[in-house]
UniProtKB/Swiss-Prot annotation:
Gene field: pfs2
GO biological process, one term: chromosome segregation
Location in or out of the cell: Nucleus
Protein role: Required for 3'-end cleavage and polyadenylation of pre-mRNAs. Also involved in chromosome segregation where it has a role in chromosome attachment to the mitotic spindle.
Principal location: nucleus
Protein name: Polyadenylation factor subunit 2
PANTHER family: PRE-MRNA 3' END PROCESSING PROTEIN WDR33, WD40 REPEAT PROTEIN
Biased composition (Polar residues): 601-610
Region Disordered, annotated ranges: 1-29, 480-519, 574-610
A UniProt-annotated Pfam family: WD40
WD repeat coordinates: 96-135, 142-182, 184-223, 226-265, 268-308, 311-351, 381-420
Stored InterPro entries: Pfs2-like, WD40/YVTN_repeat-like_dom_sf, WD40_repeat_dom_sf, WD40_rpt
GO CC terms of this entry: chromatin; mRNA cleavage and polyadenylation specificity factor complex
Source organism (scientific name): Aspergillus oryzae (strain ATCC 42149 / RIB 40)
Keywords tagged on the record: Chromosome partition, mRNA processing, Nucleus, Repeat, WD repeat
Length: 610
């Protein structure tokens, strides 16, 4: 992947220029770092070949900066997981609330990262520039606030979230909350998993139970009981009717979702099981992590552990599989360390004897599990517990959420880059400062700059949310003459009839809106003898104000009167016609009906029939 370089930033003063009171001049901020995977994908799509022919026609990548243009996405290197290990720190993000991050999940298309924290809020981060996009209340409560679990459906149409008080909420991809199950559990919902068909989902809670919910009816079809303590993790096999759960009672249990029966129990761990995850690539493997400082990989066909992942000095708190490489596992610990394991490379420390894998043994059932050590260690990835890990769908960026309030992004190193081995995440802040690869003063200044950027991004997102949601047409948002625009940050006012309230009707100049009530028989007699009666507000034998009185017509007007001929007679006698005034009670032109100006119209082209 191609991205801007920020190496050497600690030794070169190219950060935010100092303010006047800091002894410097004011200038523009340094550009935000961007990770672009589009160019790598496009180049691979243009040069790829069938895998039996070598996969692609690009030149082999070498450790030189000139080969950055030849970087390939993980999908083009499925047989080389070592090239995908995320050893380089890309960016760190922190919310305005500065609270611990309990769960991180990439959106299905990979354009954004969704995080949930102790405040009960969802925070959305851009997946390319890593800037803040929006924040919203998700599981907020005055007594028990906090987002504890998130899960996207396989169809990418729904998101479910679990809260600290035991509630589960349904969300659309636009993060519109459409349903809430308030009494899903009696305690915090620690994990969620969808069935392969997306018709049901599984929840694990600290109330010692697991529940299978029907997504449509929002009711619990089955309650799985068998754990004796808090259930910390669960997962649903991607293709099989098989459930797995891990608990504080040190047990890993397999369940049949149809009969709610426990199939078997694994007792390999010696402390709380913190994560249980089926592999989406090799669906015969299950990975678990525990507070006993180890993680294990089980083979479902043998129903036993085949690998023990060692190396952590503190309890393992999180675990994730790579979405493309079946042999790459990443784990996070309570001391903030981030380790990456390759299942086909034991990486045994010097002085220790490597163990044989059960697959290579003539007696796999009785061969001890192979011990695997990390292929790479990021010892100081965070300063507190790493509670959640999640890979980008393309497999090139790993996101981590921690108790230290930070969300950090990690990726592979570029060709020829080795400076990352001396940064503060690998050797610590004191050692990095001693070697000159990190400056404590620059770190504080960079933190202030990032906080300012996040505040600015949040302010811009709030302005976007204040836009009117009614009927708005482009280019019709102006303030009326003499009026004052709404104070909505947009400085605009809708025109009447284009989404704004209609103006009051014009006055009727003293003409009553309706005639007084009269007996129909009497009205017919009056019309047949002396014409229509005058309104009370208009004296008889007088016209409307400003208009002359037309000569009275005796008798009843004929039904087929010619309006055009009548107009000619009035004009020949010198009687002026009032402008914009149509004589009432005139009969329509014969043989017309429809639209103005067309044959068969009931309405003439103008008020006088011309």
């Amino acid at each position: 992947m191609a991205f801007y370089d920020d190496s050497g930033a600690d030794s070169q003063p190219f950060g935010r220029p100092q303010k006047p009171y800091e002894g410097g001049i004011v200038g523009p901020r340094r550009p935000r770092l961007v990770t672009d995977y589009g160019s790598s994908l496009v180049q691979w799509m243009r040069t790829r070949r069938p895998r039996y022919k070598g996969g692609h026609r690009m030149e082999t990548e070498r450790p030189s900066a000139s080969y950055i243009v030849d970087m390939l996405p993980p999908l083009a290197r499925i047989h080389s997981p070592v090239d995908t290990i995320p050893v380089r720190h890309l960016h760190q993000s922190i919310g305005k609330s500065k609270k611990p991050i309990t769960v991180v999940r990439w959106t299905p298309e990979g354009r954004r990262l969704l995080t949930g924290g102790h405040t009960g809020e969802f925070m959305l981060w851009n997946g390319t520039a890593f800037n803040f996009e929006t924040v919203m209340d998700a599981h907020y409560d005055q007594l028990q606030a906090g987002v504890t679990s998130l899960a996207w459906s396989h169809s990418h149409d729904w998101l479910i979230s679990g809260g600290q008080k035991g509630d589960i909420k349904y969300w659309r991809p636009n993060f519109n909350n459409v349903e809430t199950i308030d009494d899903a559990h009696h305690d915090a919902v620690r994990d969620l998993a969808w069935s392969p068909s997306d018709t049901k989902f599984l929840s694990a809670s600290d109330d010692t139970t697991l529940k299978i919910f029907d997504f449509t009816s929002r009711t619990a079809d089955t309650v799985l009981t068998g754990h004796n303590w808090d259930v910390k993790s669960c997962d649903w096999h991607p293709t099989k009717g098989l459930l797995v759960s891990g608990s504080k009672d040190h047990q890993v249990k397999f369940w049949d979702p149809r009969t709610a029966r426990c199939l078997t129990t694994l007792h390999s761990h010696k402390n709380t099981v913190t994560a249980t995850r089926f592999s989406r690539v090799n669906q015969n493997l299950l990975a678990t992590s525990s507070r006993d400082q180890t993680a294990r990989v089980f083979d479902l066909r043998m129903m036993r552990d085949i690998c023990i992942l060692r190396g952590h000095e503190k309890p393992v708190s999180s675990l994730t599989w790579h979405p493309i490489h079946s042999s790459l596992i990443s784990t996070g610990s309570e001391d903030g360390s981030l380790y990456h394991y390759l299942l086909d490379e034991p990486n045994v420390p010097s002085g220790q004897i490597p163990t044989i894998a059960p697959y290579d043994s003539p007696d796999p059932a009785n061969t001890p599990a192979q011990v695997i050590y990390p292929a790479h260690r990021v010892q100081y990835a965070h300063s507190a517990t790493i509670w959640s890990l999640d890979w980008h769908p393309l497999g090139h960026i790993l996101a981590s959420g921690s108790k230290d309030n930070f969300t950090r992004f990690w990726s592979r190193a570029r060709p020829g880059e080795t400076s990352y081995m001396k940064d503060r995440f690998h050797i610590g802040e004191e050692a990095a400062e001693a070697q000159g690869t990190w400056s404590r003063g620059f770190g504080r200044r960079q933190m202030r700059e990032e906080e300012e950027q996040e505040l600015q991004d949040e302010a811009e997102s709030l302005v976007d949310q204040r836009k009117p949601t009614g009927s708005v047409l482009p280019g019709i948002q102006i303030a009326p003459p003499g009026g004052t625009p709404h104070n909505d940050g947009l400085g605009s006012q809708l025109l009447p009839g284009i989404g704004a309230p209609q103006p009051p009707p014009a006055p009727s100049a003293g003409i009553p809106s309706s005639m007084p009530q009269m007996d129909p028989n009497r009205l017919a007699a009056l019309l047949s003898t002396q014409g229509a009666p005058q309104p009370n507000s208009i004296p008889p034998n007088t016209g409307f104000p400003g208009f002359p009185m037309l000569p009275a017509l005796s008798g009843t007007p004929p039904a087929n009167v010619d309006l055009a001929e009548l107009q000619k007679q009035l004009m020949s006698q010198g009687i002026p016609l009032p402008q914009n005034f149509a004589p009432q009670h005139f009969s329509p032109l014969p043989g017309t009906g429809g639209l103005p100006g067309l044959q068969g119209s009931n309405t003439p082209d103008n008020p006088y029939g011309r």
